[in-house]
């Protein structure tokens, strides 16, 4: 309100001063003698200045909320690279073909549930010298209640491990020896035919030929 009153007062004083100065200037021009031939035009009185509009009150500025200080960013620690152990390429080349067999072996072991809790299955899996996988052999091992029973009871071989010796008659032996004289390494087809003739399995015929070759080799080395 004080600012508005001051503005009104200044505008009124300024207006009166302008009007008085303009009237004084008109009187001086009219009273002065001009020697020139051109008539002096009368100066029109100055129109009063319009009053200045009052300045609108400035709205109060809202108080600015204090800004919280920004927390400093912690430096990110570098991640240590994970070191992968080196694999021997030769060993890795042998392990690649064995992956399906190992998976099948573990799946089969999960499915097997022993009926007798006193019987444990011992799986024997070996690798041959050339890197091939040997078929695992399941052996049953009975848990003994005392160590004395282990010493007294000898271990017996299962029927699968026992080698059955097959005795051949003279006629069957003559058939195999006649073929051996012709070819001591018969093909699978010939072994099947011989097995049908003598009433044996092809595997038994193959074992007979192997034993016969081994026996002849030993006799030859002994004579030399």
Curated annotation (Swiss-Prot):
Disulfide bonds: none
DNA-binding region residue numbers: 161-220
Chain intervals for the UniProt region annotation (Disordered): 139-162
InterPro entries, sorted: HD, Homeobox_DNA-bind_prot, Homeodomain-like_sf, HTH_motif
GO MF annotation list: RNA polymerase II cis-regulatory region sequence-specific DNA binding
GO biological process: regulation of transcription by RNA polymerase II
Classification via Gene3D superfamilies: Homeodomain-like
Keyword DNA-binding attached: yes
Annotated GO CC locations: host cell nucleus
Keyword Lyase: no
Keywords: DNA-binding, Homeobox, Host nucleus, Transcription, Transcription regulation
Pfam families: Homeodomain
Localization, UniProt: Host nucleus
PANTHER family: HOMEOBOX DOMAIN-CONTAINING PROTEIN, HOMEOBOX PROTEIN HHEX
Protein's UniProt name: Putative homeobox protein R749
């Amino acid at each position: 309100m004080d600012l508005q009153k001051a503005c009104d007062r200044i505008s009124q004083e300024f207006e009166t001063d302008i009007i008085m100065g303009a009237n004084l200037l008109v009187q001086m021009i009219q009273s002065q003698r001009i020697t020139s031939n051109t008539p002096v035009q009368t100066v029109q009185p100055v129109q009063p200045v319009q009053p200045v509009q009052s300045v609108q009150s400035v709205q109060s500025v809202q108080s600015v909320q204090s800004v919280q200080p920004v927390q400093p960013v912690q430096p990110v620690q570098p991640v240590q690279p994970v070191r992968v152990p080196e694999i021997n390429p030769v060993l890795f080349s042998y392990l690649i073909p064995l992956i399906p067999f190992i998976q099948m072996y573990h799946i089969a072991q999960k499915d097997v549930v022993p009926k007798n809790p006193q019987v444990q299955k011992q799986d024997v899996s070996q690798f041959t010298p050339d890197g091939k996988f040997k078929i695992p052999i399941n052996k049953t091992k009975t848990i003994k209640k005392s160590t004395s029973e282990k010493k007294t009871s000898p271990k017996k071989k299962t029927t699968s491990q026992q080698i059955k010796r097959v005795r051949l008659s003279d006629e069957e032996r003559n058939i195999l020896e006649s073929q051996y004289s012709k070819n001591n390494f018969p093909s699978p087809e010939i072994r099947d035919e011989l097995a049908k003739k003598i009433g044996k399995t092809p595997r038994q015929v193959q074992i007979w030929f192997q034993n016969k070759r081994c026996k002849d080799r030993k006799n030859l080395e002994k004579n030399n």
